[in-house]
UniProtKB/Swiss-Prot annotation:
Involved in DNA repair and RecF pathway recombination. Belongs to the RecO family. It holds the Pfam family RecO_C. It comes from the Bacteria. One of its GO terms (cellular component) is bacterial nucleoid. This is DNA repair protein RecO. Keywords: DNA damage, DNA recombination, DNA repair. GO terms for biological process: DNA recombination; double-strand break repair. The keyword Transport does not apply. It comes from Cereibacter sphaeroides (strain ATCC 17025 / ATH 2.4.3). NCBIfam families: reco. The gene is recO. InterPro entries: ARFGAP/RecO, DNA_rep/recomb_RecO_N, NA-bd_OB-fold, RecO, RecO_C.
Amino acid sequence: MLEWRDEGALLSVRRHGESAAIIEVFTASHGRHLGVVRGGASRRHAPVLQPGAQLDLTWKARLDDHMGAFTVEPLRARTGIFGDRLALAGLNAICAMLHVVLPEREPHVGLWRESIELMDALAAPGWPAAYLRWEMRLLEEAGFGLDLTRCAVTGSREDLAFVSPRTGRAVGRAAAGDWADRLFPLPLALLGQGPASGPEVRQGLAITGHFLARELPLAGRPLPEARARLIDLLARG
């Protein structure tokens, strides 16, 4: 019998049979993982098995390639943001993006920590900029980090104004020349310079979305609707 214990955030839950549930969690040391919770569809478990809930998890299975079963204990609920439409959309986008980007059972310790911090930040103003930075980390985890440190043409670190939609590298204003209208404008929010305005966050998400959408279809997984709903709410202000 195989067994481990870990801490994780609940990404999704679906009914399994009459009384059980299959949950998907993002754990600190075991990555994105699925398992059955016996009695998970019961009234007792319903308040615990909510998106974003932080759980103490024990997983058991006979063989490593079996789905296995979880026993769960609540550590922290995030139901406090459920009355905030934008924050709830942010939480749903986080859970959905982790589902489509991360392979199963592959540890991403740094990303797990940053994901928990982002979920915590949803209760306070200003989190959309943190969400943008988190999507940049997702790109890194997917193997395609943006290089915004210097101009791809000249090597200069000054006056970076655009991002190439082909390479994900920054381009200086002067170096862009006649190609400027074919490049993404580079918002300062992506460079971590100054406060991030709503339009800058949306510009940044257009860039991260372009590269995430380009990379993910290779695995047959388009960007989730939850992300589109978040961007729509951000655009409405």
